[in-house]
Amino acid sequence: MAKIKSLDVITVAIILLLVIADQATAITVQADCIGPCNDDCQQLCKSKGYTDWTCASFRTKSSCCCKPPRHQIFEQNAQLNN
């Protein structure tokens, strides 16, 4: 019985470590990823109204990700104060 409890504790610990490791390696990208990254990625993003693009790697493949324009924080504060 004690051996089964010990095995359960070890299993839970391993699962938690794997989840933590996966979250630590995750990258947050503020972008809309459309499809595979190729030479047409920039044209595709510009045709959809985006100003910037990047090729982001997810696990074993690379995707074309269109990034929305960044908003200046100071510009937003100035608009709120007026």
From Swiss-Prot:
It comes from the Eukaryota. Keywords: Antimicrobial, Disulfide bond, Fungicide, Plant defense, Secreted, Signal. Residues 1-26 form the signal peptide. Disulfide bonds join C33-C66, C37-C55, C41-C64, C45-C65. One of its GO terms (cellular component) is extracellular region. It is found in: Secreted. GO terms for biological process: defense response to fungus; killing of cells of another organism. Belongs to the DEFL family. This is Defensin-like protein 75. It comes from Arabidopsis thaliana (Mouse-ear cress). The gene is LCR45.
